[in-house]
From Swiss-Prot:
Signal peptide: none annotated. The 4 large subunits of the cytochrome b6-f complex are cytochrome b6, subunit IV (17 kDa polypeptide, petD), cytochrome f and the Rieske protein, while the 4 small subunits are petG, petL, petM and petN. The complex functions as a dimer. Gene3D superfamilies: plastocyanin oxidoreductase, Single helix bin. Keywords: Chloroplast, Electron transport, Membrane, Photosynthesis, Plastid, Thylakoid, Transmembrane, Transmembrane helix, Transport. This is Cytochrome b6-f complex subunit 4. One of its GO terms (biological process) is photosynthetic electron transport chain. The lineage of its organism: Eukaryota, Viridiplantae, Streptophyta, Zygnematophyceae, Zygnematophycidae. It comes from Zygnema circumcarinatum (Green alga). The gene is petD.
Length: 160
């Protein structure tokens, strides 16, 4: 637990700043609810106003109309579903593919229990969590790139 220095209210410079009302928060005033109930609506309404302004100034086209008689040869999902699509596409048994997809969050839930004795927040001092993150990132990128390729090149990414 850190040691915090309390403000010296007998300091004339500090008293002059406080008398001018510099800063919204005064010493001893809690941040919740005084500050946060003031700041949150301003940020939320500002974000909504910026989004509405951008949507009005730059309307994008919805796209070309769908033609039910001309289907594409291979239907691809959105880019963020590429790794999951690649798992389902390459695993021959669909039940095994669904179980592999369910194993990803189940495996991530076990990481804190594997490293529960380690109290450090530095990633270099938590080797299990860092290794799981790096391997998961590489595998997700590999599966995502492979999903956009034909099935015969998807596992090797066309390199071999």
């Amino acid at each position: 637990m850190g040691v915090t220095k309390k403000p010296d209210l007998t300091d004339p410079v500090l008293r002059a700043k406080l008398a001018k009302g510099m800063g919204h928060n005064y010493y001893g005033e809690p941040a919740w609810p005084n500050d946060l109930l003031y700041i949150f609506p301003v940020v939320i309404f500002g974000t909504i106003a910026c989004n509405v302004g951008l949507a009005v100034m730059e309307p994008s086209m919805i796209g070309e109309p769908a033609n039910p008689f001309a289907t594409p040869l291979e239907i691809l999902p959105e880019w963020y579903f590429f790794p999951v699509f690649q798992i389902l596409r390459t695993v021959p048994n669909k039940l095994l593919g669904v179980l592999l997809m369910a194993a990803v969050p189940a495996g991530l839930l076990t990481v804190p229990f594997l490293e529960n004795v380690n109290k450090f927040q530095n990633p270099f001092r938590r080797p299990v969590a860092t290794t799981v993150f790096l391997i998961g990132t590489v595998v997700s990128i590999w599966l995502g790139i492979g999903a956009a390729m034909p099935i015969d090149q998807s596992l090797t990414l066309g390199l071999f």
